[in-house]
Swiss-Prot record:
Lineage, top ranks: Bacteria, Pseudomonadati, Pseudomonadota, Gammaproteobacteria, Alteromonadales
Ranges for domain OBG-type G: 160-333
Name of the gene encoding the protein in the UniProt record: obg
GO terms of molecular function: GTP binding; GTPase activity; magnesium ion binding
Protein name as it appears in the record: GTPase Obg
Family as reported in the entry's similarity comment: Belongs to the TRAFAC class OBG-HflX-like GTPase superfamily. OBG GTPase family.
Cell compartment(s), UniProt: Cytoplasm
Keyword Cell division: no
Amino acid sequence: MKFVDEAEIRVEAGDGGAGTVSFRREKYVPDGGPDGGDGGDGGSVYLVADENLNTLIDYRFERFHRAERGKNGQSADCTGRKGADLEVKVPVGTRATDTETGELLGDLTKHGQRLKAAQGGYHGLGNARFKTSTNRAPRQKTLGTPGDVRMLKLELMLLADVGLLGMPNAGKSTFIRSVSAAKPKVADYPFTTLVPNLGVVRLDAMSSFVIADIPGLIEGASEGAGLGIQFLKHLERCRVLLHLIDLMPADGSDPVDNAKAIVTELEKYSPKLAAKPRWLVFNKVDLMFEDEAQDLCKKIADAMNWEGEYYSISAVQGKNTKELCIKVMDFIESLPEDAIEESDDEEVGFKWDTYHKETVENYEDDDDFDDDDDDDFDGDDDDDFDGDDDFEVIYQK
């Protein structure tokens, strides 16, 4: 299946159903009071994280998602049915952003987590709501309020504990193959890896972590060179980055310049990402004598002004890879647990929160029984349901 990590969709919540104007009509009850029911609330749109999905490709072709409208009220004080909510399933790790306002709606980081993306409209009020001691036959009603409409940008960001950085052909895919069951394509030409790959490193029955391999970076990636920096976002959730450096690049380039180029591109993309814990890992030590490899590792580290510890491995032979994974596991376990923010269904603001209350409070009934075409009995006999009832609509969409 093609890997797609970005998509734009339009979500439309359902409008609220309108209230109705109706009067009780029964045998021996010639002058029944108002019994117009309220409408139903419109359905809302929710994003739901689903661990069975791993790409946003479906939303490249299915871009419009609309919840059900609330039903209108009926006579006999019958309330309209609420519109059904719509659930849009997305992969775990999806981030939703409003494209028009730039507002970050939230991250879906756990299976089953729900995020309200669009609030359904509020129901309209029937004329029974406007009955007062001085106005026994109100002809007012309100229509339902419109539901939210949003254009959302969905971004899938892989959930991994460890991220791999490096130039093309630095040995990232070979490393993830050697320490996990993942089998990304490996070849001796640049950009063999075109999409991110995940692997689970399992040290024992109780200790494991997830590692992410992304396509290699080259100098000028922030300006679009190579595959650009579009995949760096998949490292934003990682807790530690492993910067793999090829000691003997096939193109004869300088390892020091290559390493510095990666750091530069990382800082251009995101200073926050560049500030994450980063370990230097020198790969392909099997291509030279051990003393020569150690001297070269120290030379590169000194040229980068590296003050921390660094590691040397041979991914293809599995040399020192297990020891490195054990140290990574110990480091991850020493970090405090990240607080996962739960999405609140009520986070998304809705402009009609006090609409009904204000409508009823501001309503001024007209009981002067004059001829100014208001809500009193003006001789039009609007109780006969002749299709020409003159009633006042408080809210018009």
